[in-house]
């Protein structure tokens, strides 16, 4: 299910820390307008895989391609203009409005001084609009709900104007309403905005509803790219967990 249209591709990728790979022989790809969902037990390597695809960890083998080009050929700024990672955020931000927090996503465009142009401010407003959070712009980031915080984190990633967005457990700590709302936004962004999305999820029922394609990650290894029908067969889920 991988082809030349894939925006983010892993070829025979090996990932991990230290000298021994955690997982190897990983092959996957995601196209514009497509959502690829990673499922599997805790500690299997989903976060490590996402961080490697994002360029935060160096591969221990194999290749990551972004828009057909080796990820290592991009500068950090060039990579950030094409790919964004939304990871869990726990650090407290002192007296930071949601607008200012989202505007930090403009760093690939503002240069070292971080001065926002009119275009930058427009992109911040657009990102807040896309996630339904314009009304939070002037609120203190520390004083909003978990569901609102996830929307703001997503808006900051979208502010980079990426072609690919990676999300590590974006529904963690949300109630069921918050989970559904966030995944609905993601689905709209992918299918209407032609964004390529790779995300990890624990909730299998939600993963089955949102996924266009699925990759199963377990300590024993990583599957190829599967259809939801293949991935969520009862015997496959029993073997995975």
Where are these regions (language model features)?
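The feature captures the beta-strand-to-loop junction immediately N-terminal to the Walker
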Residues: 39-41
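Catalytic Walker B motif of ABC-type/P-loop ATPase nucleotide-binding domains
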Residues: 165-168
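Helix-to-loop junction immediately C-terminal to a conserved catalytic motif
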Residues: 54
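Conserved catalytic motifs of ABC-family nucleotide-binding domains
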Residues: 161
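Conserved ABC ATPase signature
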Residues: 115, 140-144, 148
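Conserved ABC transporter NBD signature motif
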Residues: 62-70
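Conserved ABC ATPase "signature" region
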Residues: 103, 118-136
